[in-house]
Amino acid sequence: MTTSGLALVVPPLFGSAAALVMLRTGTGWVGADGAPWQFVVGIGMACAVTALPILVLLMEKLEILRQPLGQRILRYASLDDVAIWGVLAVILLDWERVGRQLAFLLLFGAAAWALRRLMPRLAANDRWAVSLIWLIACGFLADWAGLHYMVGAFLSGVVLESAWFEQKRMDQFRDTVLLVMMPVFFLSTGLRTNWDVGGAAVFGAAALLLLASVAGKLAGVHLAGRILKWAPGEASLIGWLLQIKALIMIIFANILLDKAIITNESFTALLCMAVASTMLTSPVVKPMLARLAPVRQRLD
């Protein structure tokens, strides 16, 4: 909990500071429906995001996923992921529709309780149909409540257990989604970029956000390492792995843009930051793993 907490709390402080710099040095960053505090908190939380699916794939490629070190990192990232989406839900609260949002949360809680009792009693094939209906219903109702359908989709997955589904079919389903839907998502994402404030301004903002994201995550994890007395170099390795942004960051930024909390220019800067963050991770981490082989053996 110490590591997860510091890895979650420190990066938003760095990111919020970067957002304040953006507000003071230029215009065109805050969306039409966004308050300055929503922009600052949203950008701050964006700097704390860890792309859990991409992190899993990277650690699998590095052959540390199923080692104790990999499982620790996965646990840290999972706890942060839940907290970040919770904060996003608060950012998106619409006080004009707070009644709907309260109704959604109450209905979701009751339905989640019923679903968790129902699913273990269903046949394996029926669980797939029920889970897809559950996903669609949560996304639709979250959007109706003024949150976002992606928030609903995330909440729908939180209450499902992987043990309810056959791993082979889950892998096939994931591969199908990645093959069919992800190219369309990235195409639509690319079409939403905007350079009206100027390429230099966007790239400058992206560099500032990248610095805040990496420095914030490393600072938080290094502080945890000092408290927990980790071996030298261990905090840097874990910090670099936890700062990977990739797909989840892009989804996060899309939600902020859909709700007009940020502009297309801010979205473009966040997108550039996410790409740079992801591209940097593997080249930085591989030499660290080689240098820290004795530490890994001790941890394993």
How should each PLM-predicted stretch be described?
Residues 14-22, 26, 83, 87, ...:
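Alpha-helical membrane-inserting segments
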Residues 2-18, 75-88, 128-142, 177-190, ...:
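Small-residue-rich segments of transmembrane alpha-helices in multi-pass membrane proteins
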